[in-house]
Structures are given as C-alpha cells and as structure tokens.
Amino acid sequence: LSGVDLRGKDLTGADLSGVDLRGKDLTGANLTGVDLSGKDLRGTILFRANLSGTDLRSTIHFTPDTSPDTHQVVQRQADGIGSIPISGTLASSYDLIEARTVPIDLDGSDADEPNQWTTVNAMTDSTSTKFSGSLEESTGWYRLELRFSMNGNLVNSISISPIGVGEVFIIAGQSNSANAGIQRQTPSDSRVSTWGKRGWQFASDPQPIASGEKGSPWPLLGDLLATRYDMPIGFISVGLGGTKVEQWLPRSTDKFDRIVMALNEVGPQGARALLWHQGESDVGIEKEKYILMLKELINASRIEAGWELPWGVARASDCLNKVSIVNAQQSVIDDDPLVFEGPNTDEMCGSEWRYDGVHFNENGLTEHARGWYNAITVLLQQIIKK
C-alpha cells in the first residue's frame, strides 16, 4: 500500500496484518472489523475513521474523536484569537500531552518558526483513555503538532495540517444558497474550507451538505475574504432547494436540524454569522406572516446556539417584482440590530445573471459572492478594526 491514498477508503474486514501503517493518513476510512491488535500505529492518523468492531488491543495510536480536523477553521474573536479544540482517545499510557502550532504558507511549507509548546492535558488518571483540551492561537494558517510523554520521556508525536483561525460562516436558505449555480467553483486560496459529514475539507463545489450538485458563490466569497483579510475562511452550507421559510422552523420539519448540526460543529461563539438567502418559494405569502416566521427562526437559532448569533439576510424573491417578500426581509433587518443587510439579488434578474430565470450563471455567482463580501466587510469594520 506504499503511496496509496487511504483517506476515506472502505477497508471493511481487510487483512492488514503485513501492512506497515505507521504514519499513514486514514482520515475517514472505514475500518469496520479490521484486526489491528498489536500493530504499531504511531503517527497514524485516524481522524473520523469508522473503528466499529476494530480490535485495537495493545496498539499505539491517537484518535481525535472530534477535532482538530485537517482544513478545520475556528472562529477568531474580536482580539484576533481563536480556541483550537483538541480531543482524542489513547490506547497507550501518557501522562503529558503538549501542542504547538507552526505557521505555514498557502502551499503548506513552513512560514515561520514554531510557536512554544503548551500543555494540552496532564493525565492524572492512568486508566483514562480520553482527553480534551484547547490551544489559544492568533489568526493564521498552521500545522498543529502534538507530542505525548510518559515519565518525562517522549513516546509519540503527530501533526495535523492545515488548520486555521479566521472567519466562519453558516449558510442556510434555498437553492441559491446551495449548489444550484451553473458551474462548480473552486477557491484559488487554499485557506478556504467547508464542512460536511466527513469533516472539514477544501471548499470546492459542490458544498458537501447543501442540496444540489452544481456551483455556489461560497468558494468565490471565500477567496475575496481570504485575500482582503489575509486569513482562513470556513463555511458550513446547509441550504435546501425549494424550501419555504416555514419549513425551517423547529416546529415544522427537520430542516432546522441542519442549522443545529452546523451550530454544534462550530460550538459557542464559533461562527461570525449565519447567511440567509431564501424567499423565492414564499412568493405570495403575506408580508407580516413572512416577518413573523423569519424572526421566529432567527430567535430559535440563537436559543439553540446559546448566544446572540448574528444573521445576514439577503433580499430575494423570484425576480417577478414580488416586493412584499423583499420588504418583509428588509423589515426583519431593520428591526434587529444583530441582523445585517445581505445582497439584494432581486437586482440580478434576467439572462445576464441567471441561466434559467431563477438560478445564477457565472456572472450571477460572481456578483452574488461580491454582494456578500461587501456586506461582511461592513460587518467586520464594526467589530474588528482592519
């Protein structure tokens, strides 16, 4: 298996008895029923690997249960510092776990000297197999290094790269918030990431949770923001085509669970804002009814988050002069100081912007991204002086 990329591979029941797995990256691999007993897994990366029924007796390994993940971006706070969560499961005895970051360039090469080692966890119970901690780090793009010691002796080490501290956005709504653009987009900046059920990854379309298989504005927006602020950008896009605002309410369907899933991934204060682009399917609804439902959704998301999550709301209908929806969206923006104006995509109608009258062509995706960029720039000017 030398040189074979095993990430995400289905290895169910495979005979790996003669395979040297030291240092292999098995991120997301299915190892169900694989006998790994007695194997040396030092340096082996088992992030989000399926280990159901896997025999790990007497192995030497490190398995982060939740994070950090490669390409993961954590939200910086107003002081530019973000908290990188670190957790894992140990199959061998350690009494000290330390971490440090190494600044890296866009190509992954070292950009500066490593930062100082910091204690993540001092194991007081030698029988414990799980640990958790965090590392406070300034805005940037890094390789995370972990080392494990016992009685003052280094016994294992591992590195995870890349990870970032920057800006994170949750995205919800209907098809124009999802993967309905005419062409898939790919970021030109390696610091633009997205999250899906298999973890964080480079943010090429299609976005992994949102509906559809085409393109979105988010890789383009990520490039704009990464260039403007010189930092990593993370997205979690959970949009679903054809949905009405009522369907996103927690009392209606399971659509709200998608927002909850994103909130659980980022954690408290873990996203700059939720970006909402929806309204095409609600043409004909009374203005006041739309206002009440969108406000209910925003409040429900904040209750679930446990903090005052900002929202960005686009002005969007079906391009047929249905001003009641746009006026309703504007009313929600005006009534809540933590809701900011997103782009008015009703200004982008016709074949110049949309390939089928509804969904964006290449020009439309570019302008949609530019609209969110302008809105977010205004938001960040109010929060962070840069």
Predicted regions and their residues:
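Cell-envelope and extracellular/periplasmic
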Residues: 62-386
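Tandem repeat scaffolds
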Residues: 1-63
